[in-house]
């Protein structure tokens, strides 16, 4: 019986780990679970999509589940969230976010590559409708919908890391102050 490797997370680290696992073991059954709609997208390109420099959001998609299946023989499940890890049973519990069903999957090796989680500021107003966090393509779509409205003239960015600085440039391209 061949090893089963489960990868939790399907963006940069998860897809890279899954592809590496395939190179290390051609016979292993490899299953990748991603709770979002997309795998392997260019997260650093999100500000350029918001600015309009990247016009088509599909340009942000580096790989598709179909590509991974065909090229690497890796089963990819998007909109599937691992809700529980049962180390004693060597199983994960996975929820299909579209269907609402749950299923347990056995593993021999488990790779956790879930990435970072943006922290909402614990201040009054942080949950207002025009307060955004940028982590994925869906977030970028929501920000873009907000900033293209003609009444939007100003933006505030909290965070001065690379993405924050690129967002400042993106808003500038859009004519925002």
What are these regions (language model features)?
Residues 61-62, 140, 164:
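Generic non-transmembrane alpha-helix signal with a bias for helix starts/N-cap capping motifs
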Residues 120-121, 165-167:
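Glycine/Thr-rich phosphate-binding loops of Rossmann-like dinucleotide-binding domains
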């Amino acid at each position: 019986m061949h090893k089963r490797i489960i990868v939790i997370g399907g963006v940069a680290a998860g897809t890279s780990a899954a592809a590496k696992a395939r190179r290390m073991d051609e016979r292993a059954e490899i299953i990748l679970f991603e709770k979002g709609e997309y795998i392997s997208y260019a997260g650093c390109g999100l500000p350029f999509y918001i600015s309009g420099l990247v016009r088509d959001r599909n340009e942000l998609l580096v790989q598709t589940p179909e590509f991974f299946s065909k090229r690497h023989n890796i089963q990819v499940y998007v909109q599937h969230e691992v809700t529980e890890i049962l180390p004693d049973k060597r199983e994960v519990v996975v929820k299909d976010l579209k269907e609402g069903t749950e299923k347990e999957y056995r593993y021999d090796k488990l790779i956790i590559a879930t990435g970072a989680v943006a922290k909402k500021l614990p201040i009054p107003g942080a949950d207002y409708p025009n307060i955004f966090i940028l982590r994925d393509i869906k977030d970028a779509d929501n920000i873009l919908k907000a900033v293209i409205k003609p009444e939007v003239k100003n933006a505030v960015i909290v965070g001065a890391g690379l993405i924050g600085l690129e967002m400042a440039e993106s808003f500038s391209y859009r004519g925002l102050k």
